[in-house]
Amino acid sequence: SYSPVDGNRIASVLTSDEKTFEKVVVKSQEAFKEWRTWPAPKRGEVVRQIGEALRQNKEDLGKLVSYEMGKSYQEGLGEVQEMIDICDFAVGLSRQLHGLTMHSERPNHRMYEQWHPIGTVGIITAFNFPVAVWAWNAMIAWVCGDVCIWKPSEKTPLCSIACQQITNSVFEK
């Protein structure tokens, strides 16, 4: 990874091949079998903890976004704040995943809609919003009971690694 700020090499990272990707897909499907059974408010609590971890790491992650992507420091902080804000929104959503109940044409019969998780969600993000777009999608998917596979921009791999480390620290609890 090279910084557009000064052209310096920041770090080198490995890229995934097709075989590794297939393993990730299988792991995501296994994780989905359990994650989908968690009640939405419990999933929301996990997302709340992710938001708290992001708050604790806001400055460092903001600096990394700024340096690796080329944004100003304030824009880097703003992008991390967007992640925190969507966590807060998703936590509220986790208690609002209710459906509708409606009358049917049949006597003494009612219909209802109910939300169900769908599975693995793929998230592809561009370099210009290396972390916020991922959070916008992942946090909502997680409270809805889905799991995510993230394909970040090859120009900002360190931002995605940092986010995964922060997120993993919460999921490991």
For each feature predicted by the language model, list its residue ranges.
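Short, acidic, Ser/Thr-enriched surface-loop or helix-capping motifs
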Residues: S3-V5
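Glycine-rich loop-to-alpha-helix module at the N-terminal edge of alpha/beta enzyme cores
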Residues: G7-H98, N108
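Rossmann-like NAD(P) dinucleotide-binding subdomain of oxidoreductase/dehydrogenase enzymes
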Residues: G99-K173
